[in-house]
Amino acid sequence: PGVNPGERHQIYDAMKQSLADLPRVDSAALDLSDFGRQGSYYARQSTRWLELQAAAEASGVSDATDALADLARWLPQHIPPDDATGIIHGDFRLENIIFHPSEPTVLAVIDWELATLGHPLADLAYNCLIYHLTGADGPRNAANPLAGGIPSEAAYLARYGQRTGRGP
C-alpha cells in the first residue's frame, strides 16, 4: 500500500533478487552445515506433510478430501530429481522483508524460525503462493488481478531463472 505501480515493481524485483541470492550463501562457510539435513528435502517434506495429515485425520481434526488422498499418492512419484541443497528461509514473503525507507532496496529478511537447509526452489514456490491463493476479494484472475506493478508469475519466474541460472 502507498506505492505506485513502478515502485511496486521495483520492490518485487528486489525481493526476487534476495530470494535468488539466498541459496548462494555457503552454509559451510557460516558453520551451518549441520543446520539441517543434507539432500532429499522434498522427499522428507512430503513424508512429513502426509504424516501430519494422517495424524490430523486420526484425531478428527481434519476432514481430508479425495483430492488430498490423490495428492498423497501423487507426491512421492513426482519429487524433483534435482536435489540441490542451500539455506532456505521457510517463510519468504514480502511481509518478512525490511526495505530501505526511500528506495527499493532490501535491508533485511526477518522471521527465520522456519529456516533450514533444503531445496532452493522450496522458497520460490512458497513465495509464488500469492499467484494461486484466493484473497478476501476472491480468486486472482483477469477480473481480479494483483495490484498494479506486481509482475505476472511467468515474468517473476523468468527473472528468478535469469538471476539463478535455474528454473522451477
Regions found by a protein language model. Name each.
Residues 86, 105-108, 120:
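Protein kinase-like catalytic core scaffold
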Residues 37, 166-168:
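All-alpha amphipathic helical-bundle segments outside canonical DNA-binding/catalytic cores
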Residues 122-165:
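Active-site activation/catalytic loop segments of kinase-like enzymes and analogous catalytic loops
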Residues 31, 116-118:
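Short catalytic/ligand-binding loop motif for oxyanion handling, primarily in non-cytosolic enzymes
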Residues 110-115:
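Activation of the activation-loop gatekeeper triad in protein kinase-fold domains
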Residues 1-87, 101-103:
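ATP-binding pocket architecture of kinase catalytic cores
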Residues 87-89, 94:
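Catalytic-loop of the protein kinase fold
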Residues 97-99:
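Hydrophobic residue at the +6 position relative to the catalytic HRD Asp in the kinase catalytic loop
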